[in-house]
């Protein structure tokens, strides 16, 4: 079986100044193609460290994807380090120099002399085309491994992996030994609670379970390695879903917002949103997905009591009698949001995100959520543990999404979430 590794370069990645989303995307994409990464290494912009890691990992891997360090500045050292690791010189690749000159001409810019560095490759390198940028990809054989060099710019990396890297490894290696993955997204239960339900199950050989906590969700990953295990994966996944019941909110989706987006897109139904404590988070997460304009009619942030009254038509007496964070208020918010454009559904939130503003009766983490439909309104008050402001908002958004998801599936809209908090009418 091919052994695949990844080397991520850059001081900003190593020091935590930026989150390495390239590595996460690459690993996920490879898994979608049935290919598993065995190791990932991060190294800074130091020539001797890069040389050492290229030499050491090339003794163990069959293919190594190297990401970053192909730019025109002094801290871009990947090509130089690869040449030194193999005992070669850097030579100008005339084809890539012409590409650079043409690229700058097309963009009506004068090419800086520093960009010529991007055409300098190790002597034995095979150029890998990058039609969407100026960084030249290349691959070099060192010891047992092919090292495949890619730019750090995310969309350039993605293009090169899809168009160059995956076809190369499929042609070069026997990839019969496959890995498959199913992902179940849950809310409202902690890892230990989920594990207590799953771990008594007898799993077939080749199938393993992993957990990833990323509040407000916990993702359950079901890995299947080998043809027999892959064939059994749907049955095992179905059994786990049955055991977990209402805790599972999506399958093979990264977020609950993505699940809602897909369901609304396919249903032709419309949604409006009125947000107070979530401050536009529900709307923003849906707008992240292309095509959301086909179902999302409007998103209103009605933070003040005055805006709740004047924009959504909340009765001032409701606010006086029950307060902004209450079932009656949030129900009127949802009804008002739905009525504006006669949407099929409307979600509304009003709560105390903290860190201040709570009372003994309504502490920080108290959130009222409502879903208005053409036939009526569902509502609930959740009392979240005292956590960060962002987490209270994201948990509230997740519960709102799940209420809508359950309505779309004609399931019970109001359910108990163990770890999110207790509920009251």
UniProtKB/Swiss-Prot annotation:
Database matches in SUPFAM superfamilies: CinA-like (SSF142433), Molybdenum cofactor biosynthesis proteins (SSF53218)
Family: Belongs to the CinA family.
Name the record gives this protein: CinA-like protein
Gene3D superfamilies, sorted: CinA-like, MoaB/Mog-like domain
Record NCBIfam families: cinA_nterm, molyb_syn, PncC_domain
Superkingdom: Bacteria
Protein's organism: Shewanella sp. (strain MR-7)
């Amino acid at each position: 079986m091919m052994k695949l590794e990844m080397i991520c370069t850059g001081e900003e990645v190593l020091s935590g100044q930026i989150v390495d989303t390239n590595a996460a995307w690459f690993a996920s994409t490879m898994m979608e193609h049935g290919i598993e990464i065995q190791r990932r290494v991060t190294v800074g912009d130091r020539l001797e460290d890069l040389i050492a890691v290229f030499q050491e990992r090339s003794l163990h891997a069959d293919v190594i994807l190297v990401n970053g360090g192909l730019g025109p500045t002094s801290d871009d050292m990947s090509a130089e380090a690869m040449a030194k690791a193999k005992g070669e010189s850097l030579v100008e690749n005339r084809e890539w120099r012409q590409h650079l000159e043409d690229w700058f001409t097309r963009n009506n810019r004068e090419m800086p002399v520093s960009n010529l560095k991007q055409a300098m490759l190790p002597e034995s390198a095979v150029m890998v085309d990058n039609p969407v940028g100026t960084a030249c990809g290349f691959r070099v054989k060192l010891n047992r491994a092919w090292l495949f060099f890619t730019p750090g710019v995310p969309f350039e990396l993605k293009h090169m992996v899809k168009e160059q890297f995956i076809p190369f490894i499929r042609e070069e290696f026997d990839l019969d030994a496959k890995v498959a993955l199913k992902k179940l997204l849950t809310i409202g239960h902690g890892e230990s609670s989920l594990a207590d339900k799953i771990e008594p199950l007898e799993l077939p050989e080749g199938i393993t379970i992993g957990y990833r906590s990323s509040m407000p969700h916990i993702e359950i990953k079901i890995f299947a390695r080998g043809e027999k295990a892959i064939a059994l994966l749907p049955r095992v996944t179905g059994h786990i879903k049955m055991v977990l019941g209402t805790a599972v909110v999506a399958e093979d989706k990264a977020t609950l917002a993505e699940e809602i987006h897909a369901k609304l897109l396919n249903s032709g139904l419309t949604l409006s949103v009125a947000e107070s404590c979530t401050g536009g988070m529900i709307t923003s997460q849906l707008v992240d997905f292309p095509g959301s304009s086909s179902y999302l009619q409007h998103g209103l942030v009605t933070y003040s009591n005055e805006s709740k009254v004047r924009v959504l038509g909340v009765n001032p007496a409701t606010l006086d009698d029950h307060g902004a964070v209450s079932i009656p208020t949030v129900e009127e918010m949802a009804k008002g949001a739905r009525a504006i454009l006669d949407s099929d559904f409307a979600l509304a939130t009003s709560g105390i995100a903290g860190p201040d503003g709570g009372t003994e009766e309504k502490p920080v983490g108290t959130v009222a959520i409502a879903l208005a439909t053409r036939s009526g309104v569902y509502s609930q008050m959740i009392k979240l543990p005292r956590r960060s402001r962002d987490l209270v908002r994201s948990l509230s958004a997740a519960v709102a999404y799940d209420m809508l998801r359950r309505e779309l599936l004609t399931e019970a809209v109001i359910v108990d979430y163990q770890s999110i908090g207790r509920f009251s009418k």
